[in-house]
A protein has these predicted regions:
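ATP/Mg2+ or Mg2+-diphosphate-binding catalytic cores
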Residues: 265-286
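Conserved N-terminal boundary motif of the eukaryotic protein kinase catalytic domain
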Residues: 16-23
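Active-site Asp-x-Gly
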Residues: 137, 144-149, 158, 187-190, ...
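Short helix/strand-capping connector loops at secondary-structure junctions
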Residues: 256-265
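Protein kinase-like catalytic domain
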Residues: 67, 115-119, 244, 267, ...
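An alpha-helical support segment within catalytic cores of ATP-dependent transferases
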Residues: 2-13, 119-190
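ATP-binding pocket architecture of kinase catalytic cores
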Residues: 23-26, 30-142, 146
Length: 286
C-alpha cells in the first residue's frame, strides 16, 4: 500500500516522494494514523478499510469547502486513494501548538464569520457524508425542523432499531422534534458539523479546524456540539456572541441538538452512551 501512497503523493505534488520515516500516531477511532516524511516534506495519512474510500473523499470535499468559506486554517488534502485492501487520505501536515492558548476569542469570531454567510436557501448538502464512521444523510429540505427531525434524530434512531435497540417510539419522537423546532426561525449556515474540542486546535496561534461533517443547517448545532463533551473556554462563546448573538430559546434547543451526537456515540460505542441517550430523550419528553 505504501508504494501506492508514495506514487499518489508524487503525482499530486509534482516531485518524486518516497518516505523514509513512517511514524504511527495515536488514533481515537478505528482509522490508523501516520506521519509520513522523506526528511524534508511531511504528510498526515489516515488509513482504513477499502470500503472507507467514500468517507475519505467526503472529508476531502468538506475540507476544501471550509478552506474556501472560512477564516480557519484548514489542512489541504493532497490525495485520496485505495488498493485492493485499504483506502487512505493524505493531508498537509500541520503541527498543532501544545501550549494552552489565549486565542479562543479568535476561534469564536472565525466560527461566527462562517455562520454569517447565508449562501444557501435550503437545509442539507450536495451529498451525504459521515459523522465519524456513521453515514450522515443530507437530503435537501426547505424546513429546518423537518430536516433535523428526519435526517438527524430519526436516522440515528433507525440505526439503533436495526441493531435491536428502541429507546423510544421513533415516529412519535420524530414528530415531537418537528413540533419543538417548528417555531424556530433559521437561516441556513455552513456548519462544521462535528465541532468539538478534538477537531480543532491552534497552529502558531492561528485557529485551525479539521475532521468536518459539513452541511447547511442551524448554526446553533455547532455551538451545542462544542458545549457537549468538553466545553470550550468562555472567551470563545463571548466572542461568538459578540459577532453573532444566539437567539432566545437556545438553551432549550441545545438539548435537542446535543441528542444527535449522543445518539451517534450510542450507535458507535453503545455502553453508557445508550444510557445517556435514553436520559436525554426522557428530558425532551417531559
Amino acid at each position: 500500500m505504501w508504494n501506492t501512497v508514495n506514487e499518489q503523493i508524487s503525482q499530486a505534488m509534482h516531485f518524486d516522494f518516497k518516505h523514509t520515516i513512517k511514524r504511527q500516531l495515536q488514533s481515537p477511532n478505528s482509522d490508523k494514523l501516520f506521519q509520513l516524511s522523506d526528511g524534508i516534506h511531511q504528510y498526515f495519512v489516515k488509513v482504513a478499510h477499502r470500503s472507507d474510500l467514500e468517507r475519505f473523499e467526503n472529508e476531502a470535499h468538506n475540507l476544501q469547502l471550509l478552506t474556501k468559506e472560512s477564516l480557519f486554517m484548514v489542512p489541504d488534502c493532497i490525495t485520496t486513494g485505495a488498493n485492493i485492501e485499504f483506502s487512505f487520505i493524505v493531508l498537509e501536515w500541520l503541527e498543532l501548538d501544545q501550549q494552552p492558548h489565549t486565542n479562543w476569542h479568535i476561534m469564536g469570531s472565525h466560527l461566527a464569520s462562517l455562520h454569517l454567510k447565508h449562501r444557501q436557501a435550503m437545509f442539507g448538502f450536495d451529498q451525504d457524508n459521515f459523522i465519524g464512521p456513521t453515514t450522515q444523510p443530507n437530503r435537501w429540505h426547505k424546513k429546518w425542523n423537518i430536516f433535523f427531525a428526519e435526517e438527524r434524530i430519526g436516522w440515528q434512531l433507525q440505526l439503533l432499531h436495526e441493531k435491536g435497540i428502541d429507546l423510544v417510539d421513533k415516529d412519535y419522537f420524530v414528530a415531537l422534534i418537528k413540533d419543538m423546532l417548528h417555531s424556530h426561525t433559521v437561516k441556513p449556515s455552513l456548519l462544521h458539523g462535528d465541532f468539538w474540542r478534538g477537531n480543532m486546535g491552534f497552529i502558531q496561534s492561528v485557529p485551525s479546524v479539521f475532521d468536518p461533517s459539513c452541511y447547511y443547517g442551524d448554526r446553533e448545532v455547532d455551538i451545542a456540539m462544542s458545549e457537549l463533551f468538553a466545553p470550550l473556554p468562555d472567551a470563545f462563546y463571548i466572542a461568538y456572541n459578540k459577532h453573532y448573538p444566539l437567539t432566545q430559546g437556545y438553551e432549550q434547543r441545545k438539548l435537542i441538538y446535543q441528542l444527535y451526537p449522543i445518539l451517534n456515540h450510542a450507535n458507535i460505542f453503545a455502553g453508557h452512551y445508550l444510557t445517556e441517550a435514553k436520559q436525554q430523550i426522557e428530558l425532551l419528553l417531559k
